[in-house]
Amino acid sequence: MENIWLEAQTNLKQVLTEQTYSTWIDPLKFLGATVDTIVLEVPSSFFQKWVTDKYLAMIKEAISAVNGKSYQIEFHVAEEKPEAAHEAKPEKEAKPAREKERDKDKEKEKDREKEKKELVPNLNPKYTFESFVSGPSNQFAYAASQAVANKPATNYNPLFIYGGVGLGKTHLVNAIGNHILAKNPKAKICYYSSEKFMNEMINSLRYKKMDEFRNKFRKMDLLLIDDIQFMAGKEATQEEFFHTFNALYESHKQIVVTSDKFPKDIPGLEERLRSRFEWGLIADIQPPGVETKVAILKKKSDMHAVNLPDDVALFLAEGANSNIRELEGMLIRLEAFASLTGQEITLSMAREVMKDIIVEKTRDITVEMIQKTVAEHFRIKVSELKSDKRIKTLVVPRQIAIYICRELTKASYPEIGEKFGGKDHSTIIHSVKKIEKQIAGDDEFKATVEDIRKKLFT
């Protein structure tokens, strides 16, 4: 049965490009077979899904062509082999009684270390002003945050930043903390979510450690509280935060708060807290425009040392909602796919990888639209594109148009052939393979094809 699979691989090698075959078919390993099923091993679940979606029908046809029999294909994901243990961990020896006092000293030291750690802010070092992309939608909040970081507790105290989920509020509060800490490593900075503040307060009440809790927060130089809206309706938490706020404000310490809403629009927030938030500066962050989203993608890809073509960045920016986290998730997914398959990122790859995420806000692409766009690009007539003339200035545009038709429409080979002057399906297949090969080996030619695709979606 393995011979059948080997012959099928040979068949597939003849109809697929070298890169496609080496990426998706060659890694498949024959594990065994039953009367009507062939079992193949795949490297990963991701690999299995891709091969199933794209090449399963082709694999079945290639196997059937060997002996005329149809087989089911069963995939098994290769198991990860656990690393062998190099050394057995020694068993803990019982400690002599004379070490008990020493253990007590160690416990005290641990408590002191714990206290020190509490003074170390859990800021994200990646969130800095340098890594933040400023644009019209967030410029005010960005400038206000920089002003606070450069001169804490001077003009804008408290600073209240509000905006929708995933627009950069958390990035800015971390950037403020990181900037102040870089200037003054001894600065006492506390960065908490409102939920964490509430949970810690509840535990302090439970274990009768409220004095420790209050002292911890009221000795800070900078208090950063994320998502203050989650304190709404929590009377005891708001009470404690109110007194903490007053103590820090009166000591001329900076307070920065974020929320998804303007203070007066947060239901369940006490009026006395609302009024205090309005003492300082309130800055909003709006959803970014396409240009800002493109700039964010380009900066992120540069940080990851990944080449992201302009047309791909535009495609992601236009297809994503205004949530920056969603945008970053798309980029990570695309980078992962490119890395796993060893391919360069292109617009066609992005469309394929993002097809379940991005519903393109464009009209349906038709063969006629592609013919018109290609003809305009090469300054020829559509009738010439559909003709049988074999001069190079017509053959190459014709093959490009056929390739894009196969890629962007649901038309079959015979249907495409009919639209190009009644050409047979073998001519259409030849054109597609010719363009695939040229794209793989000629960057300038690839850019031409990408440019035509881009015109179709703008």
Curated annotation (Swiss-Prot):
Positions of the UniProt region annotated as Domain III, AAA+ region: 122-338
Gene, per the UniProt record: dnaA
Alphabetical GO biological process terms: DNA replication initiation; regulation of DNA replication
UniProt-recorded name of the protein: Chromosomal replication initiator protein DnaA
UniProt-listed SUPFAM superfamilies: P-loop containing nucleoside triphosphate hydrolases (SSF52540), TrpR-like (SSF48295)
Any one GO cellular component localisation term in the record: cytoplasm
Keywords attached to this entry: ATP-binding, Cytoplasm, DNA replication, DNA-binding, Lipid-binding, Nucleotide-binding
Organism per entry: Citrifermentans bemidjiense (strain ATCC BAA-1014 / DSM 16622 / JCM 12645 / Bem)
InterPro entries reported for this sequence: AAA+_ATPase, Chromosome_initiator_DnaA, Chromosome_initiator_DnaA-like, Chromosome_initiator_DnaA_CS, DnaA_C, DnaA_dom, DnaA_N_dom, DnaA_N_sf
Region Domain I, interacts with DnaA modulators, annotated ranges: 1-84
Free-text domain note: Domain I is involved in oligomerization and binding regulators, domain II is flexibile and of varying length in different bacteria, domain III forms the AAA+ region, while domain IV binds dsDNA.
NCBIfam families: DnaA
Lineage: Bacteria, Pseudomonadati, Thermodesulfobacteriota, Desulfuromonadia, Geobacterales
